[in-house]
From Swiss-Prot:
GO terms for cellular component: extracellular region. Belongs to the pyrokinin family. GO terms for molecular function: neuropeptide hormone activity. It comes from Symploce pallens. Its main location: secreted. InterPro entries: Pyrokinin_CS. This is Pyrokinin-5. Myoactive. The modification Leucine amide is found at residue 17. GO terms for biological process: neuropeptide signaling pathway. Keywords: Amidation, Neuropeptide, Secreted. It is found in: Secreted. The keyword RNA-binding does not apply.
Amino acid sequence: EGGSSGEASGMWFGPRL
């Protein structure tokens, strides 16, 4: 979990790739 909301299920790939 690196971003805030995330794309898939709130994993590492979110707003801040």
